[in-house]
Amino acid sequence: DSIVSGFNIEEQSMYEALGKLPDSYRTVLYLHYYEGYTFGEIAKILHLSPSAVSMRVSRGRKELKEILKEE
């Protein structure tokens, strides 16, 4: 069965991969993709510039792809 504790295998793999990211990347990715915040909103929450948030999302996505490739 592909359902494990309410998550399908793809969701569980993504959740585990997110846990391997540095906090700075994990936080912005979570706020943007799971909570739906814009880069501007995240910037205000974390006291960063919108461009810094954009860079962290970009780098975090790249690192996440590498982690998922390894699995």
Where are these regions (language model features)?
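Acidic, proline/glycine-rich intrinsically disordered inter-domain spacer in sigma factors
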Residues: 1-19
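The N-cap/first-turn positions of alpha helices
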Residues: 24-25
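A short pre-motif secondary-structure segment
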Residues: 28-32
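DNA-recognition helix of helix-turn-helix
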Residues: 46-70
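Short acidic-aromatic loop segments in the C-terminal HATPase_c
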Residues: 33-34, 58
